[in-house]
């Protein structure tokens, strides 16, 4: 669509893309098998998305010479869903039919324990998610003020992953999505008297991230220098009795 003597242009597309027979890992095998599942063409994916482009171009005289300029903005988004995968039990360790690509499953937190007494009298069993705490010696082997309170979503009094399936995830739920959303770009250009200049900016509106084992190393585990990556303001972000509204829980060794 063009407006204002073709100076303003708007275009858009919406699409549905079906990807069939994707090469994916086979069904999870028992550990006693001693090998990974072979890859096979056994997955289908449906992607729904759109793209919108708005542009403006014009010119005017500057010191007797034409000054041309243009601005364009692009916005796009897409969501993908697994439509076929050999995982009838919907194990969370694999893809499953109906799964939105990039799902992040995890536990919800209800803040920190305010006092040692509250932690000691906590009725919800958190042993499965507090294995590192239980390994600590002495009083540090128990919940204390500043430790995390996990949310008991299924109300059974025990924090657990259930059967680790989409139908029985225990106290886990979808807490985010790692796929980028709302991709956008801005292009600026201008020309005058034989000179040209242009600039391009791009980004995404949203993307959730969950740290993996080496996620604190920006360049990955095999390119990192071996020194501390602790942020400069880390002490201000850790829970203490004087800082009960901290971002991080109680610091443990």
Question: Which positions does each model-derived feature cover?
Answer:
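Conserved small-residue
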Residues: 40, 59-176, 218, 228-248, ...
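Outer-membrane beta-barrel proteins
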Residues: 19-25, 63-65, 79-86, 206-212, ...
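Transmembrane beta-barrel domains of outer membrane proteins
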Residues: 1-2, 13, 53-57, 74, ...
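Outer membrane beta-barrel strand-and-loop segments of large Gram-negative receptors
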Residues: 11-58, 108, 147-150, 157, ...
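Transmembrane beta-barrel architecture of outer-membrane proteins
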Residues: 7-9, 37, 47-51, 68, ...
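Transmembrane beta-strands of outer-membrane beta-barrel pores
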Residues: 14-20, 58, 75-81, 192-194, ...
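Transmembrane beta-strands of outer-membrane beta-barrel proteins
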Residues: 8-10, 69-71, 186, 192, ...
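Flexible, surface-exposed loop regions and adjacent strand-edge segments
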Residues: 26-35, 86-96, 214-224
């Amino acid at each position: 669509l063009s407006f204002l003597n073709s100076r303003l242009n708007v275009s858009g597309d919406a699409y549905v893309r079906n990807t069939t027979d994707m090469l994916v890992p086979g069904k999870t095998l028992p550990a006693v098998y001693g090998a990974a599942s072979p890859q096979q063409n056994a997955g289908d994916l449906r992607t729904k998305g759109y793209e919108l482009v708005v542009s403006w171009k014009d010119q005017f005289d500057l010191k007797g010479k034409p000054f041309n300029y243009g601005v364009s903005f692009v916005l796009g988004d897409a969501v993908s869903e697994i439509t076929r995968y050999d995982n009838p039990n919907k194990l969370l360790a694999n893809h499953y039919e109906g799964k939105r690509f990039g799902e992040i499953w995890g536990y919800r937190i209800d803040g920190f324990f305010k006092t040692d007494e509250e932690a000691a009298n906590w009725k919800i069993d958190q042993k499965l998610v507090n294995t590192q705490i239980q390994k600590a010696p002495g009083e540090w082997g128990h919940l204390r003020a500043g430790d995390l309170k996990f949310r008991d979503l299924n109300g059974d009094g025990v924090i657990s992953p259930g059967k680790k399936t989409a139908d029985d995830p225990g106290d886990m739920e979808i807490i985010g999505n790692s796929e980028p959303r709302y991709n956008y770009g801005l292009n600026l250009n201008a020309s005058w008297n034989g000179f040209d200049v242009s600039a391009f900016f791009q980004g995404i509106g949203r993307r959730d991230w969950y740290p993996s084992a080496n996620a604190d190393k920006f360049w990955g585990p095999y390119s990192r220098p071996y020194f501390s990556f602790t942020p400069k303001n880390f002490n201000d972000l850790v829970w203490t009795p004087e800082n009960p509204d901290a971002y991080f829980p109680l610091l443990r060794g």
